[in-house]
């Protein structure tokens, strides 16, 4: 199959959705790489833009194909009488189609999750959904404004996925998702993944921090999804014990390891020691105009986090903001400033800082 990152797949959308009957698409990839999130966000947004709508104007219906039998998926045959009184069989309307109708939306996405893990009989009845010329299920037409997309794991991922039937694959375009650490780091920064994890991924993402596929041995491994889950535990722990707290022992290490395995956890622990090269929140608050800005991108991310977490009042938030604006990596500076302003808004901290106003005007579109 064609290998492509999410960014590369997204580049196809202006052309893919430039027709009234876009070809169905299947995304194959490892566990936890973000296929579902990509379909719900980037794909939904692109389809909406092609229609002159917003993402919220579109319906979104998810159906997990695995665990369904063919009748449950396509509808159940029931005996009925025709006008002449003769008995005949008629299929009930498929539950999936009822879900689509219940949204009340003219346009939307039907997302068929875990498609490769579905029984072959289910793949067979779903075949017409994957053919834009048929666009139906169990003999019932699907609404013309609804796009069909499926996703699932590869057969090599040890998740119960099988090869898709050939008569299904020649009607769709299939991409095998190639995980991109830089793309994930951008997403993670916008979705409150802890900066220590993002910095570690930036530094070690290309040398085995993330698993390309499940290991041969039966153990936890690091995926984009599992490290995102681990981030919640790390964030809660460091918020309570301080951003410089040791993570090489006790409860926090166990919690992280239970998500990403021992090897990736040790990589994160080793990287966390580098926090000693980054200014502390106290140092930033003491002199935000002169406090050191690290050269390394990963260190800058940690320094920005120190600045954000040092903000406990409106005045300290202004000082943290001043330091953040001095950071030389634009994405880190912008996203950290945005994060800090969310904290300021939640705490109802007012500011008279000219820098904040200038920043908001300059980056209004990004914000």
Question: Where are the regions a protein language model picked out?
Answer:
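Surface-exposed polar/charged interaction patches
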Residues: 203, 207, 240, 258, ...
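Accessory nucleic acid-recognition modules appended to NTPase machines
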Residues: 253-311
């Amino acid at each position: 199959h064609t290998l492509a990152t999410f960014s590369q797949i997204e580049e196809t959308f202006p052309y893919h959705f430039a027709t009234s009957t876009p070809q169905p698409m299947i995304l194959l990839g490892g566990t936890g790489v973000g296929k579902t999130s990509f379909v719900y966000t980037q794909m939904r947004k692109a389809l909406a833009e092609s229609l002159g709508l917003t993402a919220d104007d579109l319906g979104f219906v998810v159906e997990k194909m695995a665990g369904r039998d063919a009748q449950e998926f396509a509808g159940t045959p029931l005996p009925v009488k025709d006008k002449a009184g003769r008995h005949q069989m008629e299929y009930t309307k498929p539950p999936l189609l009822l879900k689509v109708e219940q949204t009340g939306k003219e346009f939307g996405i039907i997302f068929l999750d875990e498609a490769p893990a579905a029984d072959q009989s289910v793949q067979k009845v779903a075949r017409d959904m994957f053919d834009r010329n048929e666009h139906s299920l169990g003999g019932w037409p699907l609404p013309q404004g609804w796009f069909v997309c499926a996703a699932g794991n590869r057969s090599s991922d040890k998740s119960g996925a099988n090869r898709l039937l050939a008569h299904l694959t020649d009607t769709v375009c299939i991409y095998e998702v190639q995980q991109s650490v830089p793309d994930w780091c951008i997403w993670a920064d916008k979705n409150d993944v802890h900066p220590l994890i993002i910095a570690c991924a930036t530094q070690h993402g290309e040398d085995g921090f993330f698993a390309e596929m499940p290991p041969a041995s039966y153990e936890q491994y690091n995926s984009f999804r599992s490290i995102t889950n681990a981030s919640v535990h790390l964030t809660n722990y460091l918020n309570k014990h301080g951003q410089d707290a040791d993570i090489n022992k006790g409860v926090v290490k166990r919690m992280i390891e239970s998500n990403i395995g021992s090897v990736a956890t040790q990589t994160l622990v080793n990287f966390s020691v580098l926090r000693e090269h980054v200014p502390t929140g106290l140092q930033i608050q003491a002199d935000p105009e002169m406090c050191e800005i690290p050269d390394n991108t990963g260190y800058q991310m940690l320094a920005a986090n120190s600045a954000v977490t040092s903000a406990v009042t409106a005045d300290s938030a202004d000082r943290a903001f001043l330091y953040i604006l001095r950071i030389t990596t634009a994405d880190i500076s912008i996203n950290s400033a945005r994060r800090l302003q969310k904290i300021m808004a939640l705490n109802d901290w007012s500011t008279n800082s000219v820098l904040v106003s200038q920043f908001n005007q300059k980056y209004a579109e990004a914000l």
